[in-house]
Amino acid sequence: MKKKLSLVLCFIFAIGLLSGCAISPEPITPDTASGLWDKIFVLPLASFITLLYNLLNHNLGFAIILATAIIRGALMPLYSKSNKSMAIMQEIQPKMQRIQKKYENKKDQASQIKMQQEMMALYKEYNYNPMTSCLTPLLQMPVFLAFYQAISRHPLIQDAAAAEFFGINLGSTGTVPNYILAFVVAGLTVYSQRLMNKNMKANMNGQNNQTSDMMMKVMTYYFPFAMFSITIGTPFAFGLYFLTGSIMTIIQSFIFKRPAAKK
């Protein structure tokens, strides 16, 4: 659980760092793409957005929304697996703590080996893999950063005609539409975090866990503020990514609510 919290905190740090980052003035194209990151993540994603743009009657806003929905939908099974693993972890947490307490004052190598063996036996009994519960934060980081760069560096963002979406310039920052979208995104983020926290507490079966409580508080109070700040300071198009992602998260919470609650 502590490892998962560390990953979440790293993701939050990246979001905070991004909120103060300047947008790269260099459009992403096959000629300007440099390094593995650009060639493997940013350029293919930007090209995918361009493909959808051409299919959707040259509407860049809808192309970004659809690209976000498709990629988030494709990753949903992995998110589901991570959430189920997290639910199992919450269920076996008391047994894990009892094992740790049993060997709390036994620091010799033999005792530590026995503790690890008991832990592994517990994991095997519940078919639990600690790394699986870390899939969500591990996946979110590269997807988040790739989308940011693919959108902010997309050649069409700098084209005033192509970047118009219902009269709004998708490349605009700090404008009234950005603030309006920021409030909507922050509101949806608050709602989605409450849903996830509710599901997490249900999986804990009334048991309190200090690390879980800390993670829920961090997610609940910091994420909406971070989303609000970034939506204002980045292109309006990136706010559409947040908007779609928040809606997908809410849908995901409802889809996987029942299986998690039965644990």
Residue map of PLM features:
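Helix-loop-helix
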Residues: 2-13, 17-263
